[in-house]
């Protein structure tokens, strides 16, 4: 349910049943990388919300929580959500402030229609993610790492007649 905030401004809300700690970790990391990060909320089912967050790497990261959002597709400040999640123990309704839909960079990935091409061992993904983080630290200046390094394919998976190339920027753990 959307509610009127100070001076009659309509604000967005997110009611979380479970999954708050994982969401808190993701959003806190995203804000640490980009204080102006945005969050977009998609009501996947009656009680499941996909929460997407922007990153400075042109990759959108996400977490799924049990909950209900005031408006499907609402975009809010990641910093505001992070602050609300710090104050909230595990479940409850969060006041996310005013919508900022215009700040979202593009379309979300489709909610359905995916198929598993292959499964990667978590140790491989973790090792690549750690190397990606080391790479970003090496280029900690305002320009960051060269996009050619971030866009470089680090894993190629094949299966069911499909080939998928995964670039480094998709594996950087935020």
Task: For each feature predicted by the language model, list its residue ranges.
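Ser/Thr- (and often Asn-) enriched beta-sheet segments in non-cytosolic proteins
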Residues: 163-165
């Amino acid at each position: 349910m959307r509610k009127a905030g100070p001076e009659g401004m309509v604000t967005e809300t997110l009611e979380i049943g479970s999954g708050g700690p994982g969401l808190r970790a993701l959003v806190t990391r995203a804000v640490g990388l980009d204080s102006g990060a945005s969050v977009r909320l998609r009501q996947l089912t009656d009680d499941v919300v996909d929460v997407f967050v922007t990153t400075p790497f042109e990759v959108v990261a996400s977490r799924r929580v049990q909950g209900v959002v005031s408006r499907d597709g609402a975009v809010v400040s990641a910093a505001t959500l992070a602050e609300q999640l710090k104050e909230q123990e595990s479940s409850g309704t969060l006041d996310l402030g005013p919508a900022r839909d215009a700040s979202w960079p593009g379309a979300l990935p489709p909610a359905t229609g995916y198929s598993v091409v292959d499964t990667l061992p978590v140790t491989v993904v973790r090792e690549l993610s750690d190397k990606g983080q080391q790479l970003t630290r090496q280029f900690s200046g305002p320009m960051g790492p060269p996009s050619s390094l971030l866009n470089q394919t680090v894993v190629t998976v094949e299966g069911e007649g499909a080939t998928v190339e995964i670039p480094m920027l998709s594996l950087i753990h935020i």
